[in-house]
Curated annotation (Swiss-Prot):
This is Endoplasmin. Residues 1-21 form the signal peptide. The lineage of its organism: Eukaryota, Metazoa, Chordata, Craniata, Vertebrata. It comes from Mus musculus. Keywords: Acetylation, ATP-binding, Calcium, Chaperone, Disulfide bond, Endoplasmic reticulum, Glycoprotein, Hydrolase, Hydroxylation, Nucleotide-binding, Phosphoprotein, Sarcoplasmic reticulum, Signal. Disruption phenotype: Conditional deletion in the intestine leads to postnatal death without affecting embryogenesis. Defects in the proliferation of intestinal crypts is observed, probably due to impaired Wnt signaling. A motif (Prevents secretion from ER) lies at residues 799-802.
Amino acid sequence: MRVLWVLGLCCVLLTFGFVRADDEVDVDGTVEEDLGKSREGSRTDDEVVQREEEAIQLDGLNASQIRELREKSEKFAFQAEVNRMMKLIINSLYKNKEIFLRELISNASDALDKIRLISLTDENALAGNEELTVKIKCDKEKNLLHVTDTGVGMTREELVKNLGTIAKSGTSEFLNKMTEAQEDGQSTSELIGQFGVGFYSAFLVADKVIVTSKHNNDTQHIWESDSNEFSVIADPRGNTLGRGTTITLVLKEEASDYLELDTIKNLVRKYSQFINFPIYVWSSKTETVEEPLEEDEAAKEEKEESDDEAAVEEEEEEKKPKTKKVEKTVWDWELMNDIKPIWQRPSKEVEEDEYKAFYKSFSKESDDPMAYIHFTAEGEVTFKSILFVPTSAPRGLFDEYGSKKSDYIKLYVRRVFITDDFHDMMPKYLNFVKGVVDSDDLPLNVSRETLQQHKLLKVIRKKLVRKTLDMIKKIADEKYNDTFWKEFGTNIKLGVIEDHSNRTRLAKLLRFQSSHHSTDITSLDQYVERMKEKQDKIYFMAGSSRKEAESSPFVERLLKKGYEVIYLTEPVDEYCIQALPEFDGKRFQNVAKEGVKFDESEKTKESREATEKEFEPLLNWMKDKALKDKIEKAVVSQRLTESPCALVASQYGWSGNMERIMKAQAYQTGKDISTNYYASQKKTFEINPRHPLIRDMLRRIKEDEDDKTVMDLAVVLFETATLRSGYLLPDTKAYGDRIERMLRLSLNIDPEAQVEEEPEEEPEDTSEDAEDSEQDEGEEMDAGTEEEEEETEKESTEKDEL
């Protein structure tokens, strides 16, 4: 023990001597060296650049190598649209900067989806790196944030194309939508993901962005930008990634919060917990570990044990090394998301909030879904699916309807994402439904085109449609009428037209305005429940607005008798009803066409027949003489009460509303045979025998069939009925002339009286004529002055003589 004590004392003395020596060196130091410790404020521009380069050096590259890279790299200017878009993103989303991480992770997930899909047909695709992950690392010392994925990566050309240019049409649409959203006060943060420009949100928090990427078909390259321009150069380190992309952000001073581990973890959980690949964050944690004791501590412990224990002679055992418990900070990759897909879990185990969070994550929407359904289908094909109805219709829902990708269903095969670009996963009219489908029964190692033709896809589609209609049917009536129908009512009507197999189910989802209520909409089920006892048809009237429909002469008698009439006010409505022959055993009757009949007693029937006989001369005169080439026939009307007459289409002809719609078609050229056929069909002219105009016409034609005034009146009544019945007049000038003639007669003005001619305007004088006239006027004035002077002298002479 005494020897150990002496050795310890010697060590202390030696240490003290070294400290004194260091102190002497510090004292002898120069003033410049002391000042150099605090020269940050007086550094030159070159030193600032050097310090910056040192701060953002990449792994394996020092400051001089970074400088050399920048000098040799090829510089590019951003496309004009990209500059505009970046400015708009930065200015509009500066209050919601955190979405940058969501967009970078989303892009990483897309890259991983692509390489996994490629690997199904190319066994060497994953040779560079077997794992499929996203890793995030914060570097506080260097002010850097790294996001790395092992996805498909980018070639040099793709770096230039994907990160430096954008399709002009897409950019223009994005800018327009951003502007509209800002004007409407709506959130703009979701738009950047929907339009594929999320990468540029990195400049919300970064002064510089460095992208290192390795594609299987190219060497590793580095892309760098400060948002003003960008450069690309081959990575001198070679292939360090194996495959994939690392995005390095040099964070702005005010964005330093995004280097905090808790902040990054919370953002990943908030936005990306349902990404289908593991997301890791480089994290620290405190662990308690066993460490071997040092020799002095071990000897001391052994001595204490030998003093306390009694000497017992036992067989010697092998001595175990002595250890102690120590707390250490350990850094490792921490998994942040539950990578088991939510649709693979039983629906009973998934909370409503999880469905909402998953919907927002994969659809890039900010609102909760209106409805959702989670189910497992079994039978000919087994698959799991979650379907959602969004709260509002996606933008451009009917732009190029059916001709482009329009559905939002992501197809997975054995948890491997295949595509979201199938046109046939959902019918066109359900293009607003979003969701995922995952099946184990579909083949993996085939092309997308081959898979699209697979017979099982038709079975999947059929079940998806049925489940979707079940989901929509379960939406509460109030929510359905107030929200769903306003957003997606047109889709349901198109479904009735297009989907023959589900027409009956879709008909139950239809809603229309009706005469039953001034504002509320009604279903066909509700209409049938309110039908009169002997009513066998569902009556409807089509028009450009409710006001036009309910003021039409065709509904006068129906409303007076208490029949409910459905009002069709949208262009697609009449097509929809025409495609639906009946509902619940009741056929539809367009009240603007032939076939409207009422239940009548024997007495009423006799009275009607007597009226028809009384007006037979007028009806024949109209058909054979006054309106000979304009109508098919003239009859006494059963549907008119206030109007004098109406123009009724045949059962298979066009109503006024349909004719207006067909003639307004953008592709209408006037050469379509069927269109011309329907448009040229003559109509039935119905008269109201109780109207004073009609009764007076009957009296007049009995007196004189060739009365020109009555002939004019008949034509004016026909043309007025044409307009009131919803049709267009082929010759509006002739109609106007006839109205003028009728007004002249009513005011006792001679029909042949001509319009008074305007007085002729005096011709304008030329400059020479003006000068001549001024000269003549001057001479006349001079002559007049002389005559006045002579008369004045004469008068004065006469006064003198007197």
